[in-house]
Regions:
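Glycine/proline-rich, flexible active-site/cofactor-binding loop segments
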Residues: 75-89, 105-133
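N-terminal pre-domain/capping segments
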Residues: 1-85, 161
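Acidic/histidine-rich catalytic cores of soluble enzymes
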Residues: 126-166
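Catalytic-core regions built around general acid/base machinery
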Residues: 46-53, 116-124, 152
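Charged helix-capping and loop-helix junction motifs
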Residues: 21, 72, 106-117, 144-151
Length: 166
């Protein structure tokens, strides 16, 4: 495996800020790619300088579903960092009812979430970017109908990408 094939998911370092020493550590480990998170709120110019000074690039970023509502802002930010893939890492948290766990959604809710995600695909595609979803184990736990949440969601648009997490 080529070292350029490996990326560090920056989310895994979120408790170890500030970023300059983290990026230096990542560089020293021989990793040259990052997957960012929080693109919608980070200081892009500052982060770009940190990445450039460590010879690190980023092709993808995780953003909260709510951030998609300002697609224009995400596109501008992504392009400044040469990011090609916008990834939503989870369904939005629900505040209108109690859940057994954060993502205790029924089949209809998974289908709706898939449709909601899919409604943004063309906005990013028109700008040369892809929109995808990052899975967890719960998307592979069968719903009462026998369908998997990941199927309910991904069946809504064949252009929605899937960032698989094993």
């Amino acid at each position: 495996m080529n070292k350029q094939d490996i990326s560090v998911q920056l989310y895994t370092t979120r408790k170890f800020q500030p970023y300059p020493p983290i990026l230096n550590f990542i560089k020293e480990a021989g990793v040259v790619n990052l997957e960012l998170f929080g693109l919608e709120s980070m200081n892009i110019d500052e982060f770009k300088n940190m990445m450039e000074s460590n010879n690190i690039t980023s092709l993808s970023t995780h953003v909260g579903f709510e951030a998609l509502q300002d697609a224009k802002n995400l596109v501008e930010r992504a392009k400044k960092l040469n990011i090609k893939h916008i990834i939503v890492p989870a369904p939005p948290a629900r505040k209108d009812r109690e859940f057994k766990n954060t993502f205790d959604m029924n089949e209809e809710e998974w289908i709706t979430f898939g449709k909601d995600l899919s409604s943004y695909v063309s906005q990013f595609e028109d700008e040369g970017l892809t929109l995808g979803y990052h899975n967890h184990s719960y998307e592979f736990s069968a719903l009462p109908s026998g369908k998997l949440p990941i199927e309910c969601m991904m069946d809504q648009n064949e252009k929605l990408k899937f960032e698989i997490d094993l």
